Curated annotation (Swiss-Prot):
GO terms for biological process: translation. Gene3D superfamilies: Nucleic acid-binding proteins. Belongs to the universal ribosomal protein uS12 family. It comes from the Archaea. Pfam families: Ribosom_S12_S23. This is Small ribosomal subunit protein uS12. InterPro entries: NA-bd_OB-fold, Ribosomal_uS12, Ribosomal_uS12_arc, Ribosomal_uS12_euk/arc. Keywords: Ribonucleoprotein, Ribosomal protein, RNA-binding, rRNA-binding. With S4 and S5 plays an important role in translational accuracy. Located at the interface of the 30S and 50S subunits.
Amino acid sequence: MPGKKAPNGEFAGRKLKLKRKKFRWSDIRYKRRVLRLKEKSDPLEGAPQARGIVLEKIAVEAKQPNSGMRKAVRVQLIKNGKVVTAFCPGDGAINFIDEHDEVIIEGIGGPKGGSMGDIPGIRYKVVKVNRVSLKELVKGRKEKPRR
């Protein structure tokens, strides 16, 4: 039978499976997962959290229809020197963070590892400042250690 491409014998199962596998490479999600492209391009290198040094404090304008300045910091990661922007959650949280402080950042929890809500282009949030939880500092339960 001319033009027939798939084997169809009694013992052709292995060959059929191998043939199907080739087509998976045209699926972008499969390709990215198998080649581990997310970890390679991710500043945190696949880790859940990372340590960094605060370079500067910045305010980012919220997306429409909201208005207001969302407080964030530019952080240089210790493990690879990459610079990322991290959001400071909580009322007055930015006042507990100074330049050259050591912070721990983690993903902000947006869809597909992206930004969240009305904060444009910020994928990370500050969790700890000088080894003290930012949440505790904001609530007033703990004090920032003096150097």
